[in-house]
């Protein structure tokens, strides 16, 4: 509780919902005729995916995958696959939905996995794009971005602090991080 009471609110729920509407509009314009397979990146992408899907007005197949570098810590390690996709996406367009593009190691590995497994095109949607110069690859950027964010440790709307506060109704920055 102390983490939340001392945190700075960067985006409130209304701002986040407006950003999700903006992302949905862009995805509808780009993918409505492409019959995509949509992958929710667990656990962080769960809330964003759940809020976004009802706003997508076209048929799609939904599945999930779980790859992480954090394992409830505040800094990342090696990529660990907890669950690889179980649905076929060979010769299909894929949309990967995740909570945040930070350095991009996890998202980059998921993109590579989908491309090597036969996806026609791979698109990415993130709720948050963290603003810094430490991206894993210079060309790595999300196709659909909800909100930019300062380079601080954040939580809420799916993002956690040591496994907690994914349920926070906004995006908050940890004091001192």
What are these regions (language model features)?
Residues 1-177:
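PRPP-associated nucleotide enzymes
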């Amino acid at each position: 509780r102390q983490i939340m009471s001392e945190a700075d609110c960067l985006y409130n729920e209304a701002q986040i919902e407006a950003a999700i509407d903006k992302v949905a509009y862009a995805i509808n314009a780009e993918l409505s005729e492409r019959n995509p397979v949509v992958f929710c990146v667990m656990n962080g992408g769960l809330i964003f995916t759940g809020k976004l899907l009802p706003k997508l007005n076209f048929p799609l197949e939904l599945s999930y995958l779980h790859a992480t570098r954090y394992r409830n810590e505040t800094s990342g390690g090696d990529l660990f696959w907890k669950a690889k996709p179980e649905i076929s996406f060979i010769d299909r367009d894929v949309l990967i939905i995740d909570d945040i593009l930070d350095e991009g190691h996890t998202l980059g590995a998921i993109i590579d996995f989908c491309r090597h497994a036969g996806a026609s095109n791979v698109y990415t949607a993130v709720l948050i794009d963290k603003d810094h110069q430490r991206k894993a690859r210079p060309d790595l950027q999300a196709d659909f971005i909800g909100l930019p964010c300062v380079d601080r440790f954040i939580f809420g709307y799916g993002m956690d602090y040591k496994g907690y506060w994914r349920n926070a109704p906004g995006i908050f920055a940890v004091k001192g991080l």
